[in-house]
């Protein structure tokens, strides 16, 4: 596919297994001339093992209206909410705390997210996870 000309790159966050032609997917792909249902079927098939997880996806549209997509790991904030069973973070993170992450949970999230982060050491990835947790109003052990 390297000989095809790229005409557009679309970045979206879609729940796993729940892609449909409704906004924001339909308008973004329709404007690029991509077969919307074709993308939805491929994405849902690729993410059927991760239902409900919020997944960043980068869709590359080529000049002949074909496409390819790359899925990334869920955002750190989404992984933290899943680990603690939260709906959302704190509205006032410095005052209201909504949960507490253990060292083991931080390490597990950092290991899962490591390939999408621009870090070499696990320790650096853990610090990034801790920072995200603090900004959400989650205490870190």
From Swiss-Prot:
GO cellular component: cytosolic large ribosomal subunit
Cross-referenced Gene3D superfamilies: Ribosomal protein L11, C-terminal domain, Ribosomal protein L11/L12, N-terminal domain
Listed GO MF terms: large ribosomal subunit rRNA binding; structural constituent of ribosome
Record-linked SMART domains: RL11
An annotated GO BP: translation
Pfam families named among the record's database cross-references: Ribosomal_L11, Ribosomal_L11_N
Keywords per UniProt: Methylation, Ribonucleoprotein, Ribosomal protein, RNA-binding, rRNA-binding
Post-translational modification: One or more lysine residues are methylated.
Subunit field text: Part of the ribosomal stalk of the 50S ribosomal subunit. Interacts with L10 and the large rRNA to form the base of the stalk. L10 forms an elongated spine to which L12 dimers bind in a sequential fashion forming a multimeric L10(L12)X complex.
HAMAP family referenced in this protein's UniProt entry, alphabetically: Ribosomal_uL11 (MF_00736)
Function in brief: Forms part of the ribosomal stalk which helps the ribosome interact with GTP-bound translation factors.
NCBIfam families, sorted: L11_bact (TIGR01632)
Family: Belongs to the universal ribosomal protein uL11 family.
Protein name (database record): Large ribosomal subunit protein uL11
Organism: Chlamydia trachomatis serovar L2 (strain ATCC VR-902B / DSM 19102 / 434/Bu)
Organism placement in taxonomy: Bacteria, Pseudomonadati, Chlamydiota, Chlamydiia, Chlamydiales
Gene: rplK
